[in-house]
C-alpha cells in the first residue's frame, strides 16, 4: 500500500514522503491517527503542487535574506557602556544591545538570530554573526567603548 506521510514517522520516513507499507499498518495505524493519507493519483498531484509552492516561497525568503545581508554588509557598530577603571564592563554586551544598535540604524533585526561567540566583558573590538537564513549569514563588527 502506498501512502503519503503527513508528519515524520520514526523508521519509516519524513513528512511528504511517499512510502510503501503493509496494508494493515497503513489502514489500522497511520491513516486513522492522521499520520498519513492514501497515495491516490489526485493526492500525489496535490502533493507535487504543494511542494512546488513551498519551494517558490522558500526561494523568495532566501532572496529577501540576501537583500538584507547586502544592506548589513558594510555596517559597523559602536556600543557605549559603563566601564570600571580596569576596563571591564559592568555586566556584558550581548545580542540585545546589538539588536538595539541595529534598530537605531534602521535595521529591525530579531535578537534571537544574532550570535555573539564569546561573552563580551571588556572594552575592545568584536564580531557578531546575524543568521538571516540557514544559508545566509552576515558578520557584523562592533566595538565596545567606555561611556
Curated annotation (Swiss-Prot):
The keyword rRNA-binding applies. Gene3D superfamilies: Ribosomal protein L9, C-terminal domain (3.10.430.100), Ribosomal protein L9, N-terminal domain (3.40.5.10). The keyword rRNA-binding applies. GO terms for molecular function: rRNA binding; structural constituent of ribosome. Keywords: Ribonucleoprotein, Ribosomal protein, RNA-binding, rRNA-binding. GO terms for cellular component: ribonucleoprotein complex; ribosome. One of its GO terms (biological process) is translation. Binds to the 23S rRNA. This is Large ribosomal subunit protein bL9. It comes from Bacteroides fragilis (strain ATCC 25285 / DSM 2151 / CCUG 4856 / JCM 11019 / LMG 10263 / NCTC 9343 / Onslow / VPI 2553 / EN-2).
